[in-house]
């Protein structure tokens, strides 16, 4: 298996409900190491830049409004097959369809307030990590 990095956001709805520790425990229980982490409060410009690929979609403004509504936790996760493993751990975007025991089935309130974000490919992981972290902020844990 390949050791890879992926990017994760714990969204404002989950931060507000004090779920950071519970979600971090899920990462570690799944064999994913947290190699970078920080709390940030996105402004509109930063959120719009991060979600630029969705700019033409009807939900874009609501997404930006939500992501700027409170602090978020951004982190880099590392492990074997980290991107796929984290996607499975998150569950589907719609928590009503998420498998039992996934982060979204257990913590998400709705499709809009779905608690977490995760990269969907190696390319998006690299782009998203670089958007929030410098190389010096990532601390490999061998």
From Swiss-Prot:
Q: Which domain of life is it from?
A: Bacteria
Keyword annotations for this protein, in alphabetical order, are:
ATP-binding, Cytoplasm, Kinase, Magnesium, Metal-binding, Nucleotide metabolism, Nucleotide-binding, Phosphoprotein, Transferase
EC number of the protein: 2.7.4.6
Binding residue positions for ATP: 11, 59, 87, 93, 104, 114
Kindly list the cysteine pairs connected by disulfide bridges. Answer: none
* InterPro entries in the record: NDK-like_dom, NDK-like_dom_sf, Nucleoside_diP_kinase, Nucleoside_diP_kinase_AS
Which SMART domains would you find in this protein's record?
Answer: NDK
Indicate whether Phosphoprotein appears among the record's keywords.
yes
Q: Which reaction does it catalyse?
A: a 2'-deoxyribonucleoside 5'-diphosphate + ATP = a 2'-deoxyribonucleoside 5'-triphosphate + ADP; a ribonucleoside 5'-diphosphate + ATP = a ribonucleoside 5'-triphosphate + ADP
Q: Which GO biological process annotations does it have?
A: CTP biosynthetic process; GTP biosynthetic process; UTP biosynthetic process
Q: Which Gene3D superfamilies does the entry link to?
A: Nucleoside diphosphate kinase-like domain (3.30.70.141)
Entry cofactors: Mg(2+)
- Extract the GO molecular function terms from the UniProt entry: ATP binding; metal ion binding; nucleoside diphosphate kinase activity
Its primary localisation, in coarse terms, equals cytoplasm
Localization annotation: Cytoplasm
Q: Name one GO cellular component term.
A: cytoplasm
In this protein, the active site sits at 117
Self-association state and partner proteins as the record states: Homotetramer.
Q: Into which family does the record put it?
A: Belongs to the NDK family.
Matching entries from PANTHER family are given as: NUCLEOSIDE DIPHOSPHATE KINASE, NUCLEOSIDE DIPHOSPHATE KINASE DDB_G0292928-RELATED
Function as written in the Swiss-Prot or TrEMBL entry:
Major role in the synthesis of nucleoside triphosphates other than ATP. The ATP gamma phosphate is transferred to the NDP beta phosphate via a ping-pong mechanism, using a phosphorylated active-site intermediate.
Name under which the protein is recorded: Nucleoside diphosphate kinase
Which species is listed as the source?
Answer: Photobacterium profundum (strain SS9)
């Amino acid at each position: 298996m390949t050791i890879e990095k992926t990017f994760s956001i714990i969204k404002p709805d989950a931060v507000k409900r004090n779920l950071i520790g519970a979600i971090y425990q899920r990462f570690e229980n799944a064999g994913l190491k947290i190699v970078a982490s920080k709390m940030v409060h996105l402004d509109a410009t930063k959120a719009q830049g991060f979600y630029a690929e969705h700019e033409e979609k009807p939900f874009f403004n609501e997404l930006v409004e939500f992501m700027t509504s409170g602090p978020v936790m951004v982190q880099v996760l590392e492990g074997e097959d980290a991107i796929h493993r984290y996607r499975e751990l998150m569950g589907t975007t719609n928590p009503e369809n998420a498998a039992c025991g996934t982060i979204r089935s257990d913590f998400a309130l709705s499709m809009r307030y779905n608690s977490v974000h995760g990269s969907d490919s190696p390319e998006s992981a690299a782009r998203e990590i670089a958007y929030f972290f410098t190389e010096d902020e990532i601390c490999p844990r061998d």
